Amino acid sequence: MRLTRRVFSHSLLGTGLAGVLGPPALAQSGPAEGVHYVRLAEPAPAGPPGKIEVIEFFWYECPHCHAFEPALEAWAKRQPDDVAFRRVPVWFREEPFSAQQRLFYALEALELLPTLHRKVFFAIHNERTRLRTAEDLSAFALKNGVDPLKFVAAYNSFTVQSKSLQARQIAAAYKIDAVPAMGVHGRYYTNGTLANAGAERGSNDRMLGVVDALIAKVRQGNRA
């Protein structure tokens, strides 16, 4: 239940496991390393000091990312203070990824992600709106009540360009080749295929159970 770099390059469509379920339980023994998640050979940057960082890697045009968003958002709201959650838009090649990466960080700079992040998904997947060029994105901003001059200034800003580059670097550190995927504290990585190993039916929501177990694992290690 993911969109891979290979699948994107052939068809721009995800091919995944069937069915989106409620958050399914893992086996009683919990997720297994090398089966439901992998440990990074070289740790990635771990985020804010004193926090357990969790990253979702996504792409706005990925239908599985769109379907995953409600469960992910609800999960994020339940996290305690020691968990720092953030999203990272991926880049597999220049177009159409660059423009949508910069869109995300422009909305972040304008403090509009809480209101417009889900609307970007809705525009692409429900309204079939093309959001692949600066002109497309400016029109989207205007339609949603954003001053187009402020949007363009943010979109072209050094801050947004720098964050887009950093996003590519962190995705490379986690060796991301499919979305949606999740990284935990610079140490662990899982995606829909891994999280659903051995399951009769697949759901990206199962990633959240794996991530919960990995957060507990990091937390226990920090206390040791």
Regions found by a protein language model. Name each.
Residues 2-95, 213, 219-224:
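Extracytoplasmic thiol/disulfide redox context detector
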Residues 30-40, 129, 134, 201-211:
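Periplasmic c-type cytochrome electron-transfer domains
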Residues 53-56, 67, 71-74, 98-102, ...:
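Extracytoplasmic/secreted proteins, especially bacterial periplasmic and envelope-associated proteins
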Residues 61-64, 91-95, 123-127, 159-160, ...:
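Solvent-exposed loop/turn segments at secondary-structure junctions
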Residues 67, 77-80, 108-112, 121, ...:
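Sec-exported extracytoplasmic/periplasmic mature domains
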Residues 78-109, 113-142:
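Structural microenvironment flanking redox-active thiols in thiol-disulfide oxidoreductases
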Residues 143-224:
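C-terminal cap of thioredoxin/glutaredoxin-like
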